[in-house]
Curated annotation (Swiss-Prot):
Autophosphorylated. Autophosphorylation is blocked by interaction with SUFU. It comes from the Eukaryota. The active site is at D137 (proton acceptor). It is found in: Cytoplasm. PROSITE patterns: PROTEIN_KINASE_ATP, PROTEIN_KINASE_DOM, PROTEIN_KINASE_ST. This is Serine/threonine-protein kinase ULK3. It comes from Mus musculus. The keyword Secreted does not apply.
């Protein structure tokens, strides 16, 4: 099948051209298939004489796992061969090198770039998690990039991977110390959650330029691993609250308090729901159908919300689409929906102002009639504070919290209020505040729609989309 030669190994059907890298027991080469396609592949060449029992087990595990899975963000094992001297794993070639080199040549990655990579890594890990597979050696060196131009992440090197249910525990030390979860070193007892710690270390390194336990010596590294100190995040560069929240929850030393796989995959910063895929366009169109229906029914607020949710899927649909003509058609549709969203925004804003005026009048009358009710006056003061907070830019969540606190009190008071004019006004006030709270919830949903602003800028739609889905 193959035989040794000077310099590069020989393998039937392939021409090996250059060494890409080497590890503990394997060397990886770039190669071309001799077929007409001249397909470029990476060949992992493992010298049999270098294998001990543990490395044979690792190699067999890697082959077993990789031959049974296909995922756009996991390196594909195309075939494997062997001869008297070597075992050859013929794999998908990734021209962009590894994530470690990508990070260090740029020193740090912008949050928006790190987020795209994290979304892709999360997608691969979700696929593995559904099959009870744990990687156990996640690190930037084991994450490859499809190319340097618009790179896609590819998870590689499954030599330490294991079939593990979430409740399985292992006691064998595996992985690289800088990226290894503390429980692997301190307790020699661990489960699948160690992969989540490693994800946190990778994200930390991408954003801050080095892993949290970067050390000058192994003894210093061991001290940091065994310490009980909380992992502190640098203040610079400035990161979004969602990003910092995810990092802190991933880098929780106690696995029982670490973010779960379910919560990781559902985390708003990861946002797997809006990852570019073949389904993005269909999801966007389905939401547009609902938006048009609500629009025709005269429910402007619901229609606006649905149009904005649809646009959240049109963005990844544009990313996913490679055909220039179809891409232009999508952009044209997006332009139409943005225009309608602008019109709906004006309608909703007008209704909002009318609701505010009505609420102020009722509250003034009710305040006059509540001079002998300190608890009622206090609840109305909280409602007034909510109205004031709502006028401040970006304070919707604070205003909503105040509205909910006020409503909690007012509903109790309403139930105990005797029939009469004050009860009627109190009932009206509760209805107004509930409407305000519901409106704010919708506002927050819209604001939390994760527009990839930089992507939209490339499409020339950023400002119009953002302004259309932001109510004043």
């Amino acid at each position: 099948m193959a035989g040794p030669s000077w310099g590069l190994p020989r393998l039937d059907g392939f021409i090996l051209t250059e060494r890409l890298g080497s590890g503990t027991y394997a060397t990886v080469y770039k190669a071309y298939a001799k077929k007409d396609t001249r397909e470029v592949v990476a060949i992992k060449c493992v010298a049999k004489k270098s294998l001990n029992k543990a490395s044979v087990e690792n190699l067999l595990t890697e082959i077993e796992i990789l031959k049974g899975i296909r995922h756009p963000h996991i390196v594909q094992l195309k075939d494997f061969q062997w001869d008297n001297d070597n075992i050859y794993l013929i794999m998908e070639f990734c021209a962009g090198g590894d994530l470690s080199r990508f990070i260090h040549t740029r020193r740090i990655l912008p949050e928006k770039v790190a987020r795209v990579f994290m979304q892709q890594l999360a997608s691969a890990l979700q696929f593995l998690h559904e099959r009870n597979i744990s990687h156990l050696d996640l690190k930037p060196q084991n994450i490859l990039l499809s190319s340097l131009e618009k790179p896609h992440l590819k998870l590689a090197d499954f030599g330490f991977a294991q079939h593990m249910s979430p409740w399985d525990e292992k006691h064998v030390l595996r992985g690289s110390p800088l990226y290894m979860a503390p429980e692997m070193v301190c307790r020699r007892q661990y489960d699948a959650r160690v992969d989540l710690w490693s994800v946190g270390v990778i994200l930390y390194e991408a954003l801050f330029g080095q892993p949290p336990f970067a050390s000058r010596s192994f003894s210093e590294l061991e001290e940091k691993i065994r310490s009980n100190r909380v992992i502190e995040l640098p203040l610079r560069p400035q990161l979004s609250l969602d990003c910092r929240d995810l990092l802190q929850r991933l880098l929780e030393r106690d696995p029982a308090r670490r973010i779960s796989f379910k919560d990781f995959f559902a985390h708003p910063w990861v946002d797997l729901e809006h990852m570019p895929s073949g389904e993005s366009l269909a999801q966007a169109r389905a939401l547009v159908v609902e938006a048009v229906k609500k629009d025709q029914e005269g429910d402007a607020a619901a229609a606006l919300s649905l149009y904005c949710k649809a646009l959240d899927f049109f963005v990844p649909a544009l990313h996913y689409e490679v055909d220039a003509q179809r891409k232009e058609a999508i952009k044209a549709k997006v332009g139409q929906y943005v225009s309608r969203a602008e019109e709906l925004k004006a309608i909703v804003s007008s209704s909002n102002q009318a609701l505010l005026r009505q609420g102020t009048t009722v509250q003034e009358l009710l305040r006059e009639m509540a001079r002998d009710k300190p608890r009622l006056l206090a609840a109305l003061e909280v409602a007034s504070a909510a109205l004031a907070k709502e006028e401040e830019a970006g304070k919707e969540q604070d205003a909503l919290d105040l509205y909910q606190h006020s409503l909690g009190e007012l509903l109790v008071l309403l139930a105990a209020e005797a029939p009469g004019r004050r009860r009627e006004l109190l009932h009206t006030e509760v209805q107004n505040l509930m409407a305000r709270a519901e409106y704010l919830k919708e506002q927050i949903k819209i604001r939390e729609s994760h527009w990839e602003a930089e992507s939209l800028d490339k499409e020339g739609l950023s400002e119009s989309v953002r302004s259309s889905c932001t109510l004043q």
